């Protein structure tokens, strides 16, 4: 089939076109179909609605959908899912139109940043401590939405033909900035694990450590420190070639995706959670005091940390792709 121009300036291709642009669009469309079907189910009174009164922790964690009701939110989800299917079909068949690209990026940001809340990063950290007691339906729906956001980001990325082609000069400084921004939260939690009441009253720390909180704090702090070290790998030789002390892998090239995918996942969690903290500060829900700043103060580094990590990952991707 030959390509032909359209009113929008896009290029028509076969419906079953192959290649990254086509299959990422189809994947986003299939996800949107499932998303819309869930909306229809909830609008019809089906069980499992993940927002509002069905989510007992929604208000506590500052969910943007704490007041949502299935009768109004269900149809909205159904309509958005249907629109997503239609846009995905357009993206799979043509390239160059602006509106589908804007929709795809808006869907990605909304699904990754707006729908999830701090429970995602909270349960990610607790998972390393072996605790899964807070897993529930709303959390699973958040993860489902994050997956959908990733699919829409991939569809948008391939639809626009990728990003810049040349390595950027700011990659190294922004990578070091991301590594440094990982430390405030890590230092505070490691201090708590060691019994040092950094930024909190000793009574609060003693109560938490008596119930095993020191183990959790050590894990959370250790994750931050490990994240800082791994971030440095984005500009170090061992981030491109496996070091000698790694059996079977030594000397082999590090797959780009092995560094990029986990870093982007971490960045998404940090941005979505960090944005919530700033929203709470703006609303006056969080007030930093001299004897209690350690509870939330270090978390204010999450948003800039996540943004810097995303930028550092992008710079790494461009540098490795140019090899």
Kindly give the residue locations of the regions a language model identified.
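An N-terminus-focused feature that recognizes amino-terminal "leader" regions
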Residues: 2-3, 14-147, 159, 294, ...
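Cytoplasmic membrane-interface segments at the C-terminal ends of transmembrane helices
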Residues: 15-23, 86-99, 152-174, 229-254, ...
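Juxtamembrane loop-transmembrane helix junctions in multi-pass integral membrane proteins
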Residues: 16-26, 65-68, 95-98, 132-139, ...
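Alpha-helical transmembrane segments of multi-pass integral membrane proteins
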Residues: 29-41, 106-116, 144-151, 172-194, ...
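Extracytoplasmic low-complexity, Pro/Thr/Ser/Ala/Gly-rich segments
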Residues: 35, 47-65, 177-181, 185, ...
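Membrane-helix interface motif
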Residues: 40-54, 116-127, 186-202, 237-238, ...
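Transmembrane alpha-helix entry/boundary detector in multi-pass membrane proteins
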Residues: 59-79, 203-228
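Hydrophobic multi-pass inner-membrane translocation pores used for secretion
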Residues: 184, 213-228, 232-239, 254-308, ...
């Amino acid at each position: 089939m030959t390509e032909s121009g359209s009113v929008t300036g896009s290029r028509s291709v076969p419906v079953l076109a192959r290649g990254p642009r086509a299959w990422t669009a189809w994947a986003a469309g299939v996800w949107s179909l499932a998303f819309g079907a869930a909306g229809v189910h909830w609008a019809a009174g089906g069980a499992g609605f993940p927002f509002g009164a069905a989510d007992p922790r929604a208000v506590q964690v500052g969910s943007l959908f704490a007041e949502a009701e299935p009768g109004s939110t269900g149809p909205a989800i159904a309509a958005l899912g249907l629109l997503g299917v239609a846009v995905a079909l357009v993206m799979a068949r043509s390239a160059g139109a602006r509106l589908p690209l804007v929709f795809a990026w808006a869907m990605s940001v909304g699904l990754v940043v707006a729908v999830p809340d701090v429970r995602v990063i909270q349960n990610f950290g607790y998972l390393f401590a072996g605790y899964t007691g807070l897993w529930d339906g709303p959390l699973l729906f958040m993860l489902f939405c994050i997956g959908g956001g990733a699919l829409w980001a991939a569809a948008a990325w391939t639809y626009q033909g990728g990003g810049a082609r040349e390595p950027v000069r700011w990659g190294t400084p922004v990578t070091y900035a991301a590594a440094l921004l990982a430390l405030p939260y890590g230092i505070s939690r490691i201090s708590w694990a060691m019994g040092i009441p950094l930024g909190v009253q000793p009574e609060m720390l003693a109560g938490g450590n008596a119930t095993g909180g020191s183990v959790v704090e050590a894990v959370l702090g250790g994750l931050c420190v490990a994240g800082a070290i791994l971030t440095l790998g984005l500009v170090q030789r061992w981030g491109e070639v496996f070091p000698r002390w790694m059996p079977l892998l030594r000397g082999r090239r590090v797959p780009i995706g092995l560094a990029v995918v986990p870093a982007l996942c971490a960045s998404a969690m940090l941005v979505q959670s960090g944005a919530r903290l700033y929203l709470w500060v703006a609303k006056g829900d969080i007030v930093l005091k001299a004897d209690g700043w350690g509870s939330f103060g270090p978390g204010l580094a999450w948003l800039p940390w996540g943004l810097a990590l995303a930028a550092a990952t992008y710079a790494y991707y461009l540098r490795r792709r140019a090899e």
